[in-house]
Amino acid sequence: MDKSSGELVTLTPNNNNTVQPVALMRLGVFVPTLKSLKNSKKNTLSRTDATEELTRLSLARAEGFDKVEITGPRLDMDNDFKTWVGIIHSFARHNVIGDKVELPFVEFAKLCGIPSSQSSRRLRERISPSLKRIAGTVISFSRTDEKHTREYITHLVQSAYYDTERDIVQLQADPRLFELYQFDRKVLLQLKAINALKRRESAQALYTFIESLPRDPAPISLARLRARLNLKSPVFSQNQTVRRAMEQLREIGYLDYTEIQRGRTKLFCIHYRRPRLKAPNDESKENPLPPSPAEKVSPEMAEKLALLEKLGITLDDLEKLFKSR
């Protein structure tokens, strides 16, 4: 629903865009590859608290689940995200029989953004590991009281089968999670920006997060962007990675921004977003906002902000706390 006009807007995936559930875009489910050999071979199990986003699913509401966690192998942007895009496209474009969808293997590879010119062996080498990682990603819904615990455990994809000789792919989803595939809070994610950011996974990950935000988003803290990338390097190095990724997003024409500081908190003010990487016919529709001037902070407030930073508490954390009350 377009809030400004009241018009119902249907979002349909094609080769240039995909409809992505907002929850998976905001959460750190798909993240950059850990570059260093030391980091790439340890701590590869990712654990994400998805309570705030996924307790809105009818499954969670019906059963009274109040905690949702996503656990599994670290899913990267360069291969795993594109395979997930292929899965979303497959369920959107083909007839779903029961809880399964079947399509030609070559077509599935194209939906994953893999050129058809690649050999069958190279296709398998790219798709097979990604399908294993995605199918190995567990989503658990639970509720615990003083005496008892209830928990429902499922997977991002229940099963995947392919046969290159017969040229088929079969994908099976949990029917109770179909709502996740067709979440009512969707945005249309343009793949043009993803394709323009080949091998720049940090920029790709920040793109999926920023594109999920509402129109005229509030300033985003540097700490929130660090959390979205879920890197293991020192904070100083992570800050450099975030700034480099933001600059890469500006270079391809996706956005413009200003980095400001309020107290001890560094923020990014987004002036506009252009997922098609070109200016609209009417640039006034972008409603660019001037950067907010840095506010003067009293010594008492500066001291409180410094204490919060030492405790690892961000402004985003405080905002969530007040919203939950």
UniProtKB/Swiss-Prot annotation:
Entry keyword DNA-binding: yes
GO molecular function: DNA binding; DNA-directed DNA polymerase activity
Stated name of the protein: RepFIB replication protein A
Similarity comment text for this entry: Belongs to the initiator RepB protein family.
A Pfam family per the record: Rep3_N
TM annotation in the entry: none
Function: This protein is essential for plasmid replication; it is involved in copy control functions. In vitro, binds to the DNA repeat units, BCDD'D'', EFG and HIJ.
Source species, domain of life: Bacteria
Region (Disordered): 279-298
An individual GO BP term: DNA replication initiation
Keyword hit for Hydrolase: no
Disulfide bonds: none
Keyword terms: DNA replication, DNA-binding, Plasmid, Plasmid copy control
